[in-house]
């Protein structure tokens, strides 16, 4: 597809029928880390304007821990996982109560969805979440999504809501993604450094790291940082969804298509949610090591991974689980969904289709990873 101009991207955002808005905890809190109701109300006001004009909004909101640690008597955000999860359990209800009150002033109902990374890794849970959000939007409700901090394991979690928001944008077939943070745009260097300047438009985010040096977040509240926001924008771009990154105070102008923050152009036509899920959300459970011939075929695109070209299988996984496909040097080539359990694969390695059919039966004469379930990385 031809890369759209900044003006075209901004117009597309303004005309978007469905928008996902992500706001981080640092944009909803006071310097002390406690929830700032005034900031929350201002954000809701901007969203309500779009909603009252007939647009659909999905709000991906952090802030459960920030809302909970004050009422529990903590002076600062807890650092150990168990206390964070307990605090999130208390804070999520308080956060939703504030949102319900704020949106209620505009006659808008809200619905809560708490999602873990594992929910996006399992096709059934993914479909259920997509179906629920579609129905909420059909009913005129604003879904408010957050990672389920109270249940998410430390090993498998988003750790921020940036990437989650991009997955949600693809899930609901959004027309735009707005990433709200505590800085007003992407800069060529940390904004505090001399000579740093704002980047108003990124036509191809895959080339971004050649022109931008990203510093760490200056916020002491959020856990995302700029890197995960860029990853979210990249996920949106490769899904065919334009994105805007800006400060929460600019939410209204960003939604209206004004030239605030940094706009990211989509880099390809909208792809399938399934392929985005495989590429970004699925957590690989194992590794299949391809020989040089198979690696070349995989790199060429649209080739299935056959047992004849696989040297080794590592990990414990079931058929349908996501796996890495590596070359012999250990480089990741692709992600895919395994066609067989890890226990079945060793007997298949190095055998062509005719041999597999003769020795093991027809049910083993299929690719280890079918090309429809394989995505290059």
Swiss-Prot record:
Stretches assigned to the PUA domain: 285-363
Residues reported in the UniProt entry to bind substrate: 62, 149, 161
Residues annotated for ATP binding in this entry: 22, 181-182, 223-229
SMART domains in the record: PUA
EC number: 2.7.2.11
GO biological process: L-proline biosynthetic process
Compartment(s) of residence: Cytoplasm
Gene3D superfamilies assigned to the protein according to its UniProt record, in alphabetical order: Acetylglutamate kinase-like, PUA domain
UniProt keyword Nucleotide-binding present: yes
Bilayer-crossing regions: none
Keyword Nucleotide-binding: yes
EC primary class: transferase
Annotated keywords: Amino-acid biosynthesis, ATP-binding, Cytoplasm, Kinase, Nucleotide-binding, Proline biosynthesis, Transferase
Superkingdom of origin organism: Bacteria
A GO MF label: glutamate 5-kinase activity
Annotated InterPro entries: AceGlu_kinase-like_sf, Asp/Glu/Uridylate_kinase, G5K_ProB, Glu/AcGlu_kinase, Glu_5kinase, Glu_5kinase/COase_Synthase, Glutamate_5-kinase_CS, PUA
Family classification: Belongs to the glutamate 5-kinase family.
Stated role: Catalyzes the transfer of a phosphate group to glutamate to form L-glutamate 5-phosphate.
Record protein name field: Glutamate 5-kinase
Organism: Bifidobacterium animalis subsp. lactis (strain AD011)
